[in-house]
Amino acid sequence: GDFLHMVRNYSFGKVSICRVHYALNEAPDFLNGEEMSQTAFQRIFGSVADIDRQYQEIAAGIAPTNPFLWTACWTTKDPSRAPDGKHTLIMDTFVPNQLSNGERWEDIKEDYVQNVLLRKLQEYTSNMTESNILGQYIDTAESLARDNLSLVNGTTAGGERTLSQSGYFRPFPSYAHYHSPIRNLYMTGPSCHPGGGISAMGTITANVMLEDLGF
């Protein structure tokens, strides 16, 4: 009874991401030099005030107008991820999983990526032009929820990272050690400690299972 009550009251939150996967001719050429261009991933934002404004917009269900960016061009470190001489780029930002004006992310995703996310990246790079982009695929809250059952409502962290859902309390009090109430059934994934985006939950759960089996 207590376990079911905790499950029903678990909060996944209302924050998702808008993510675009690019196939590129060239890796992004950042204006502040080769060292940045050869770094595998970047965090891009204007100011702390801009970040505050973005979270206010997310709370209000508004698509962020001047978002910070997370970009990763893993092919600068691992060329095998793309055909010879080509590159890939992932770029995303936090957004509300549902828009307060009734629009669907699936309907506005191309416009938002082109006119907000890409335009922001172009402020910091010299070559993120139309001729450099070979193709793209865009993930939204809807596609994330459809493709991965752990991403409930398109939220990517496996549940809110509030104090009541962190550390010893993730996912529930007394259940932070990857055991479920059912014997020999274990829990893993982003809803378990340490949470989505940090990884290692599968490895930790596997080690717990091996320890229980006497290995």
What is each PLM-predicted segment?
Residues P96-R104:
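Amphipathic alpha-helix from the class-I
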Residues G1-A82:
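Mid-domain catalytic core of redox enzymes
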Residues G33, G102, I198-S199:
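Short, glycine/acidic-enriched capping/hinge loops at junctions between secondary-structure elements
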Residues F41-I51, Q114-N115, T140-R146, G158-E160:
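Short low-complexity stretches enriched in small and charged residues
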Residues T65-A72, N127-H193:
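A glycine-rich dinucleotide-binding beta-alpha-beta segment and adjacent secondary-structure elements
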Residues A27-P28, A59-T65, E106-L149:
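Flavin-binding catalytic cores
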Residues G1-D2, R8-S11, I17-D29, K86-T88, ...:
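C-terminal structured subdomain/cap of oxidoreductase catalytic cores
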Residues S100, S126, E211-G214:
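A generic secondary-structure boundary signal that marks alpha-helix termini
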